[in-house]
Amino acid sequence: MSEAYGAQVDGTTTRFRVRSPRAGAVQLCLFADGRETRIPMQRDGDDWCASVPQDCTGLRYGYRADGTWAPERGAWFDPAKLLVDPYAVELDRRFSFDWSLSEFGVDTAALVPRAVVPPALPDVAPAAPRFTPGGLIYELNVRALTRLHPDVPEALRGTVGALAQPAVIAHLKRLHVAAVELMPIVAWIDERHLPALGLANGWGYNPVAPMALDPGLVPGDLAELRATVAALHAEGIGVILDIVLNHTGESDVLGPILSLRGLDDAAYARRPDGTLVNDTGCGNTLDFANPAVRRLALDTLRHFVRRCGVDGFRFDLGPVLARGPGFDPQAPFFAELAADPWLADRVLIAEPWDCGPGGYQLGRFPTNWLEWNDRFRDDGRRFWRGD
């Protein structure tokens, strides 16, 4: 079995592992008492690893990767950039856009959230999904639904924990909701044009590390999500996460260097001719023909099922999951998902289009998947409007 990525506490030792095939050197950066301690990591194939002889639970950390600076070749190596662990599950703050995040040689330790070594959390007991196809799925934005709710305690408004409150559950049950579909709750960064306009991204479709919950939406981290899922399950309501695995918030060539881009962009993003492919409309596209990208995606899904008991996932821009040059209905990711003991029975919902060539793939996902159907949506809208 391959070694686990991220931070792993084993008794009195904490092991760190990150993938960066083309880096010349990688440092583990530990933050405590207002100081940064840098520890050289050792190469292990395409990975870099380090061990710290203590239980680092609660400690903040990040990485720095050194090597060639050649963005035209997918090499954004800059040791001045603090990088978030792609396998981080907890962050100490939200992301905030700053142009310094894109500038070579400008240190960003003060700007980038630090990953937090998480406390041990056992797996939930395996259970079949609470939702079966045919029931009502209620798509919701956590903050928008709860931030002004008068019957939710003020401290919980706008958070995942608010969904476990009796008033919210009663509302869902009055509507006969079979499952809630939570719009993205992992940490994201605002697109670079928004701050100057006095705007912010409220939907969350611009993630950086796919397992790291947003500290604003889920201040209690995994324990909060886990408790909320359990509370909804107790009332017969399933939980589906809207998840963005098709791109990162590092955008195009002018985007911020936050995680995968600084670790080795060419090892994660699609760029067959050296140019970033933009099948997502977000500046970059993760390469699901790459086994390492598929592993990160599968580890992410497995993490939320094992640690929190979620019932399934809605996949943003689903065709990206099956792209080589075009869409492949027999793509490896689909087969690996179907063979995974934690994931095979989950509810899987595709948004069956992206911005790439042949991007409209309604009806071509595996038979055990559900699909968003824009034709039904448009027909339904016309019917109710009387068009």
What feature does the model see in each segment?
Residues A88-L91, G309, G324, D328-D387:
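Conserved alpha/beta catalytic core and glycan-binding cleft of carbohydrate-active enzymes
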Residues Q27-C29:
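Beta-strand signatures of extracellular beta-sandwich domains
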Residues R19-A25, C56:
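Short proline/glycine-enriched turn/loop motifs at strand-loop junctions of beta-rich domains
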Residues N141-V310, R314-A339, G358-G359:
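Substrate-binding/active-site clefts of carbohydrate-active enzymes
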Residues M1-T13, E36, Q42-E139, T146-A155:
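The feature marks proteins involved in alpha-glucan
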